[in-house]
Amino acid sequence: MILLALMGKPMFALAIPLAVIVAFLLLNPRLTFWLLLISLFVYAPQRIGTTFAVHPFDLVMGLLYAGIVLEYLLKFKQGLKFSPFDAPFIILLLATVISMVFAYNISYAIVPCIRIFVIYLAFRAVYSYGQIIGVRKIINVYLWLVALNGAYNITLFIWQGGQERVFGPAYLGYETFSMTALPMAAAFMLWAQSTRQRILYGGLAIMIGLGIVATQARGPLLAVAIAVPLLIFFAARKSKRESNRSRGHLLRLIFIPAVALIALVFLLKDSLFVGLFSRYEEMLVSLTNPKGTIALRLILWETAIRTFLDNPITGIGIGNFRLVHHIYPDLKLMPLHWWIFGMSAHNVLLHYLAETGIVGFLALVTLSLKGLRHSYRGFMQKLSQPDNQAAAALFIAMVVFCVTILFMRAWTWGQGGYVMALLFGLLAASRETREIKQLQ
């Protein structure tokens, strides 16, 4: 390798260790799985043309699936197990393909269609390795990764005196990570086996919450504000049913870290968190007098419904909502018209209703409701403490998914797509693992 470099062939010299690393990852797909999870927290897209970008996690995903296929062939495995989520995923994929064929601009539809296929492959990978590695272990690592990103966010936010919003290395992906991970950490805290564990997961929840504060993002905070009370309600219901824990005890466990976080923010509201409170105040005012992003969402939702009514079967094509101002030129006359260009519908259901028509919409609704139903059933079963942690975490994360598809920017592309695959894959793996235990 050194000789090649000295001979004036540095590219060949670099290619050798790179080839060794790739070969090692191909032969060790379990390690590649962990690398994929870590790479989700690095937002570093490389643009190829005007409509395509490759992310580090996409490259790792390619290596993971190549390794899975290689392992499958070398071990001569036969048959594939299917979960309750495979059918709606496949129907959603078919709907996107059909919408691509009839798209307003097919060049904008190719990449989003590939994205759905990649999400499905990621779901299958998580489903498989969730059973091998363990669902609880994967969730635990996920919580730590989100908390570390949150720690980076709040540290840099304080360092800058609260002057700028900080998202960290995950960039906007932190919104999806944080709004799922904080309630999951709260679930782990509720069913912790020791005081040490309660302090640990309570600390992780606070760190993730501080990370949200540093971003000043309103969507994740709203999601958490909905999810945590629901978690307490269903936890109390489960505890009463199993007669093993009082409601007051559950409330105290959540109450302490929640009050600590809220008190800290309010203590510094006139200094470090001035910008944060002004953004949230603007959101509350917009509920009665829509303006800013609230008004924009109303316009986008109305436009999505209008688009569906004109194209009910195939939609305007996956990935084509960003061109909706070309389809309806009158949108350019609206006050917030400039912000419509290149936007999603900021409602995943309406977005897919507009882009893929009724079939894609129903597939996504079915997938969401199946996820919620299966997660609730798993959560309400009488389980061991560690299994309770995983089941409760998946249930509340699925609640967050079902709620936020109504108002968040994206769930089916970028890092959000991989988190979606992670949640459904872990849920399928958890269900499969419980069924195997029951048979034994």
PLM region spans:
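Flexible juxtamembrane loops connecting transmembrane helices in multi-pass membrane enzymes
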Residues: 242-250, 264-303, 323, 340
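Membrane-interface micro-motifs in multi-pass membrane enzymes
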Residues: 7-11, 51-60, 111-113, 167-181, ...
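Alpha-helical transmembrane segments of multi-pass inner-membrane proteins
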Residues: 1, 17-22, 65, 90-101, ...
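Hydrophobic alpha-helical transmembrane segments
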Residues: 357-368
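Transmembrane helix irregularities
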Residues: 7-8, 25-28, 210-217, 353-356, ...
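Long extracytoplasmic/lumenal interhelical loops at the membrane interface
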Residues: 287-302, 314-356
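Transmembrane alpha-helices of multi-pass inner-membrane enzymes
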Residues: 228-229, 367-370, 392-440
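Transmembrane signal-anchor hairpin modules in multi-pass inner-membrane enzymes, especially those
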Residues: 1-97, 129-140, 190-199, 243-253, ...
